[in-house]
Swiss-Prot record:
It comes from Clostridium novyi (strain NT). InterPro entries: Ribosomal_uS7, Ribosomal_uS7_bac/org-type, Ribosomal_uS7_CS, Ribosomal_uS7_dom, Ribosomal_uS7_dom_sf. Gene3D superfamilies: Ribosomal protein S7 domain. Part of the 30S ribosomal subunit. Contacts proteins S9 and S11. Transmembrane segments: none annotated. This is Small ribosomal subunit protein uS7. The lineage of its organism: Bacteria, Bacillati, Bacillota, Clostridia, Eubacteriales. One of the primary rRNA binding proteins, it binds directly to 16S rRNA where it nucleates assembly of the head domain of the 30S subunit. Is located at the subunit interface close to the decoding center, probably blocks exit of the E-site tRNA. GO terms for cellular component: small ribosomal subunit. Belongs to the universal ribosomal protein uS7 family.
Amino acid sequence: MPRKGNTPKRDVLPDPLYNNKVVAKLINSIMLDGKKGVAQKICYDAFAIMGEKTGKEPLEVFEEAMNNVMPLLEVKARRIGGATYQVPIEVRADRRQTLGIRWIVDASRKRGEKYMRERLAGELLDAANNTGAAVKKREDTHKMAEANKAFAHYRY
């Protein structure tokens, strides 16, 4: 535990092309070894591919994908009397966004296409259509929470 209180959350600057903070967080999540320019190129190329394939505004498709991936509930391990229970809890708004982005990027990295821009575009399109690995991850998380609803009274 920190001795000097909590540090304030740092605000992310919006990305240069779409002027959107969530897109900036996606770029930061894609970034490896501090190579932000590469991450931006991947993200913007993926958005261009999405725009071509759907004919819709890429930002709309991205927001739809995010809404389909962000979890409402998750389970948290809580130890009570020597037993560990998986206690379902509601997910805070900022954590929902973080988990959604993380799951989309992780699912993209595991896809089979040759280039990351194609993998990311494919995963975002799948998520917008309520299919794909990121949406499956959300459904699994919700199933876990539903299965452990009996332990909800142990909430924090």
